[in-house]
């Protein structure tokens, strides 16, 4: 495990990766993601059987070419890489602006092209259950 993965806070000396993609193609996106993640040890943190949730920045029901949300090609490529690394399930989800219910979330999934990710092994979150969590050490 690299120092970044085990550190609690990031510093100005932590590596930053930028890799040009050129065009939205899943195979090219996979290559770019491998290169992008290499400085922090790649996907070596993924253990066989892991369930991984990707927060996809689905802020609004906008088309992928409007560049307001994470592009479905990048999420499809990342999903494939995570499954190849051993993940049992890759879930894509978010709490987009607006109501957090099935109708609104499906509108966002449709507009942003998230359903395309399902063909690459991703599961779109449709779980709206709530639970209470207590943090007695928290300060207000």
Label every PLM stretch briefly:
Residues 1-140:
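N-terminal and secondary-structure boundary signal
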């Amino acid at each position: 495990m690299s120092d970044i993965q085990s550190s609690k806070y990031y510093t100005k000396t932590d590596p930053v990766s930028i890799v040009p993609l050129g065009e939205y193609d899943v195979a090219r996106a996979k290559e770019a993601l491998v290169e992008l993640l290499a400085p922090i040890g790649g996907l070596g943190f993924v253990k066989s059987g892991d369930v991984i949730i990707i927060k996809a920045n689905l802020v609004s029901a906008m088309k992928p070419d409007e560049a307001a949300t994470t592009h479905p090609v990048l999420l499809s490529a990342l999903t494939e890489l995570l499954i190849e690394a051993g993940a049992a399930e890759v879930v894509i989800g978010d709490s987009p602006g607006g109501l957090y219910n099935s109708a609104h979330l499906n509108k966002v999934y449709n507009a942003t092209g998230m359903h395309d990710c399902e063909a690459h092994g991703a599961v779109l979150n449709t779980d709206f259950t709530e639970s209470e969590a207590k943090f007695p050490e928290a300060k207000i």
